[in-house]
């Protein structure tokens, strides 16, 4: 009789939060690129180069962009964005739902509501 060993290897997906954090870090440190057109024997060729020579050139693992993001604060019918006017924000938050960021520095109005609701409490 013989013995048999089985070895199984597999790749596991990292935690979803870890993936999101990784992508956010990449986004925050993305390098702006410029498109340069030059003529070669096969015709016009477009290449990307770092827009600012002051910064180190991006590596193959860095995120790059060559067009700026649209202004999400203002409405844009072309993209279907309604902007952030009249959105509800969180006065106490310093995050993306906070009034300073969500209202794009335009200020905000505070509204206090008083409601009477049955709580269905049992004592």
UniProtKB/Swiss-Prot annotation:
Record's comment on post-translational modification: Palmitoleoylation is required for efficient binding to frizzled receptors. Depalmitoleoylation leads to Wnt signaling pathway inhibition.
A Pfam family matched in the record: wnt
Molecular function in Gene Ontology: cytokine activity; frizzled binding
Subcellular location(s) per record: Secreted, Extracellular space, Extracellular matrix
GO biological process: canonical Wnt signaling pathway; cell fate commitment; neuron differentiation
Lipidation (O-palmitoleoyl serine): 1
Any one annotated GO CC term: extracellular space
Disulfide bonds, paired cysteine numbers: 89-104
Glycosylation sites: 90
Keyword vocabulary terms for this entry: Developmental protein, Disulfide bond, Extracellular matrix, Glycoprotein, Lipoprotein, Secreted, Wnt signaling pathway
InterPro entries associated with the record: Wnt, Wnt_C
Similarity-based family: Belongs to the Wnt family.
Biological role: Ligand for members of the frizzled family of seven transmembrane receptors. Probable developmental protein. May be a signaling molecule which affects the development of discrete regions of tissues. Is likely to signal over only few cell diameters.
UniProt protein name: Protein Wnt-3b
Organism this protein belongs to: Plethodon jordani (Red-cheeked salamander)
